[in-house]
């Protein structure tokens, strides 16, 4: 039973990491590969309760717009979390 439970947890973890295609990069990481991408827009999130929720929302929005990469440009925590990001598609 423990083996089945471990396999199920592993499968769920793999499924969760592959739900979204867009990759969140830091500005420093993106600067190394910037020439391979073109900017396709900006996205934002607001009124999220946790940083994990804000990150998930930004990645989901980037994926919906066909982005391959998103780079955070701002974030605030005035009782709730707000954030913005630039989104890029591979050339």
Swiss-Prot record:
SUPFAM superfamilies recorded: YdgH-like
Pfam families hit by this protein: YdgH_BhsA-like
Signal peptide: 1-21
Biological process according to GO: response to radiation; response to stress
Cellular component, GO annotation: periplasmic space
Keyword vocabulary terms for this entry: Periplasm, Signal
Gene3D superfamilies (alphabetical): Flavin-binding protein dodecin (3.30.1660.10)
Localization per Swiss-Prot or TrEMBL: Periplasm
Protein family (similarity comment): Belongs to the BhsA/McbA family.
Entry protein name: Uncharacterized protein YahO
Organism: Escherichia coli (strain K12)
Top-level taxonomy: Bacteria, Pseudomonadati, Pseudomonadota, Gammaproteobacteria, Enterobacterales
């Amino acid at each position: 039973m423990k083996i089945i439970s471990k396999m199920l947890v592993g499968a769920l973890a793999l499924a969760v990491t592959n739900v979204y295609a867009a990759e969140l990069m830091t500005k420093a990481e993106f600067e190394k590969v910037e020439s391979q991408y073109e900017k396709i827009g900006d996205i934002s999130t607001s009124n999220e309760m946790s940083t994990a929720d804000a990150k998930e929302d930004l990645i989901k929005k980037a994926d919906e717009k066909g982005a391959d990469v998103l780079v955070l440009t701002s974030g605030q925590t005035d009782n709730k979390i707000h954030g913005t990001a630039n989104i890029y598609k591979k050339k």
